[in-house]
């Protein structure tokens, strides 16, 4: 019996060690070697077939090709290369000049986009116009259309450029790329709308293939069917920069990772003549000065570049525009790259003349697809747990006879994308059915912002939101600020939608430290802090994406303490408890959050506060702010505005006074050029302001501002004390504004109302 047990134990031990992670059997190793041998045999077979195709060809490009005999198949292969892909347009223009008919187009990355456009019937002029008119800085963001965001998103979430999430299993989830690519995808859908109902790329006016990489296996995938916009998106999704494109539970990235110059694909499709355009850069060299981006680029393109060197030698006509030194992400001067493509192709004009066939060229051009409205009778939704068909129908644009243009479909998709819990959305049309595929934010959404303001210093703000969807949508949020003036707040915002009408309810409780900066003769002489415990209840209505009105009630316990500088400013050394209420209306129709050129921003608020701690202080009043922006031209815009406020009461708490100065507005602070942050305190004030803005680029702006102020204060010893309208103060200055991935950066120089020296201010990020 013991012998049998020993033998059985020995068998199970042998079985375990044969198939465990650490010990692998001889048979397992041999099987793996055989698998690799089979893969190499397939590669050899592929190369042999290419060799046979080349050996069959007897075409001499130095002589006129006879198109009346056996019609040679001409393929155009366009390599990847980012912004340098504009050179492809110049090559196409020269091919059209010589009326060279193209039968096959194969492209990788940007080559797949330019090639795809030509394959559906765009002319080189149309391609150039489309590319030159693209707003690349807008495409290279995750921003949703601000006009479509709800008012709560505009007020709060616009301030957080960084996002991540914690899933339902409490695993921290970082983005798979810097950008989710949604805006690029929507642009591609717009470009390829004329091919919306073409699913087989052999049926396009010119047979077409795009190259992408299966991220799971690292293998090359040749795209011959599907949605053309998705195909080109898969082909150009640069690893780490753009999130991989998910399709049928697989993830795809830039085809340049495996095959940046797919001449072999053209050969496999039976091409007799291959015209290939190479815009690839010289292979980057790793040295001590290399950075993370260089290393990632090297790793992600190693195999693709290795193939490129071989494939170059397989082209019948290799055209190499002089663009190798142009940066792949530099989208300036694209028209110059187009010219370089023309120059490079024109060198071989004598060859292209031999490939000319006006008859075949005309037949090719006559097949060009045109944009047409699409009949949509059915709607399908995939990937949704929260979004409903009812909501999708509510967002549907109004059209006649269910005929949707490309703009209608893109606007519909943008509206779905603008919903706060939607992270990605794509669509395709099959016959009379539109299918929306969505990716929703689930679990805990974490947002972050890094900020800096002159005098205030640096800060990091984080918000974590747990959404709860039902009859009432509830967002439970924790907000925190790490800075010299820390804050933490817990709140719940709930809303119930009735069509476009929304009922809002909120509750919050928090502790915050706010600074009180005190200046005299232009110098900061003291800093006090307000340590505040605050809780509020609110109820409001949003009648559109731009307007919200409501009422709030709350309790506050304020304890002001000295922090630094002059200790003798007793006015701010106070402690009080109060209950307060306010009525408010907020309107926001701005086209941009940071540097708007169009729209209105309006804030009206009436307030009341009553001390309950025995200090017998009370106050009531109101405040307003209104700014209006109008474009004067494509680059120039003008903004005008007014602001003001008045409070009255007994024993007014000095820390409740209006705070004037700095470049940004906040809850009780009003910007004024010519004063630093909190440069003046007032119980009544009025500001008139105006400014000019010039857009140098999509992200860089020149700013000029002027404002006038009159104010009164309650006998504060460190500042002028005049009655309202007794004096008028004038501030003016100029600077730059830069939209960055961290948020806006402002550098501004102005006069200083309290000093003969200029006032220099720097702001980065947002004000909370």
Regions found by a protein language model. Name each.
Residues 407, 426-583, 590, 661-670, ...:
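Gram-negative/organellar outer-membrane beta-barrel architecture
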Residues 21-108, 116-414, 418-430, 441:
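Patatin-like phospholipase
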Residues 289, 517-519, 558-565, 616, ...:
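Outer-membrane beta-barrel and related beta-rich outer-membrane complex signature
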Residues 445-450, 581-697, 702-708:
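C-terminal outer-membrane beta-barrel translocator/porin domains of Gram-negative envelope proteins
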